[in-house]
């Protein structure tokens, strides 16, 4: 017997699980049954597609036994099984990037969320919520060696080579069968999980639609009229439906059936926001059952996110690790695709180039987007919940999926300055257009890092003054997505924080008056530019400001300051910094003081402050904050 230490991440996870109170501790059994089902799926696929496994007799079953005297619970499957290396890799480590971020998220949660554990794919460890010690006995299909893994979840595990006699004898399970047996030595306070009624209740709730039979072994007792046991008999009953729910007619299924299958499929304890069940017949036959979770998957913005859709061919599991089954922007969708036409031995390379699967993918995207549209039209409250979780991925689709760009443009939502819409409500492009002024030529929007700051931005002063609505876009990807979209139907999309976007807001008379004022103000602009030098691209007379002394904008062809910061953080911006354009409000008292001043130090300080305060409002940061404070102190000292 050899002892091994858990990796640091496993120790962290076990500590979180064991020392946290979970409101639904019972999910550990769902996780163990789900793991058993996955092992059966994998072996079924190999026996049909891999010559090395075709001689193995596939006899799928999951058996659950309990001993209320010894306080143990056993889950046995006849699936693929694990050898020594598999046990070390699967039960001794968490071989996924993003582990630390996940553990930090779990630890920081106000209410420790067992749902996150299942989503992350480490559900086996949840068994330590109910067990003081766990034994795992496993024999890999096609191999003769049997291995036993044992741990109390306190930092280490034992691993030893045993033989077939280490497996408990279970009625119906062939002697020497491959697969895995998990034996939980339950905590005293968790003895309820060694009772027939509790096990049946959990399986019916979470695992009824597991596609393989689940057998419960128990002792049935007969009592006499005095309450004494007169006879005992060992019994075995199948306690799950064991049907592929997606192959059943919709008329035979209740909402509860769909919800229970979703929980089993996704390891999510919450009900889905939406489900879409489709059966296609004709030149191609396939069935899809898709779900939209109530909450975004924790890894939705990780590069190595886990795909949520499983591919089956004629009810045979093929893969759950193929990111091409749906577009990346629909990575939050969970569900199954079951094709009647794909070959069973389809490889990943064939999958990515397969015309049949490509057609299924395109049809699925149209179906899902159509269902999202129906939800938006028929249930605004539920759609707002959907948008709160998945607006950003949909916006990614505007950039990546040209074919469905129009549909996606009608689905995405934004915050707005419109007085008709509350600040916590969303609006669409179509809603914006319905509120446009009769002579309005464009849809106006503003991008930045923070909604509250954007609502108070100096750039919006002229829009508010003249009653033009502006869409608020604080998402960092908006700076990429919206310019790539360019227009919505017949209306151009214009950024309020870009140079020249305010030109059409003024009447002809106002424009002429501004041009005259600008001409008179030109010496002041030149004075400010001389002070600022190459800190700015240009200093301009502002037609958009009414209350603020200054603001910065960027040229129409330059990336925004937010975009520049994002690209630099990603290592994709190697050129010199984008120089902003400083716009100055000629009517503001501070600017008037600068105009009239002959004090060189005052002119220098005020010119720099006009730029720095505008940068602070725009980005919340300065390159030389100490110099800014010194200038501010000098000016305040000279106040009269």
UniProtKB/Swiss-Prot annotation:
Family named by the database record: Belongs to the heat shock protein 90 family.
NCBIfam families named in the record: PRK05218.1
Coiled-coil intervals, chain numbering: none
Location relative to the cell: Cytoplasm
Molecular function per GO: ATP binding; ATP hydrolysis activity; ATP-dependent protein folding chaperone; unfolded protein binding
PANTHER family, per database record: HEAT SHOCK PROTEIN 90 FAMILY MEMBER (PTHR11528)
Subunit (UniProt): Homodimer.
Listed GO CC annotations: cytoplasm
Pfam families named among the record's database cross-references: HATPase_c_3, HSP90
UniProt keywords, alphabetically: ATP-binding, Chaperone, Cytoplasm, Nucleotide-binding, Stress response
Ranges for region B: 349-565
Residue spans crossing the bilayer: none
Name of this chain's protein: Chaperone protein HtpG
Major localization class: cytoplasm
InterPro entries on file: HATPase_C_sf (IPR036890), Heat_shock_protein_90_CS (IPR019805), HSP90_C (IPR037196), Hsp90_fam (IPR001404), Hsp90_N (IPR020575), Ribosomal_Su5_D2-typ_SF (IPR020568)
Region (A) residue spans: 1-348
Residue span of region C: 566-640
Organism, scientific name: Treponema denticola (strain ATCC 35405 / DSM 14222 / CIP 103919 / JCM 8153 / KCTC 15104)
Function: Molecular chaperone. Has ATPase activity.
Xref: SUPFAM superfamilies: ATPase domain of HSP90 chaperone/DNA topoisomerase II/histidine kinase, HSP90 C-terminal domain, Ribosomal protein S5 domain 2-like
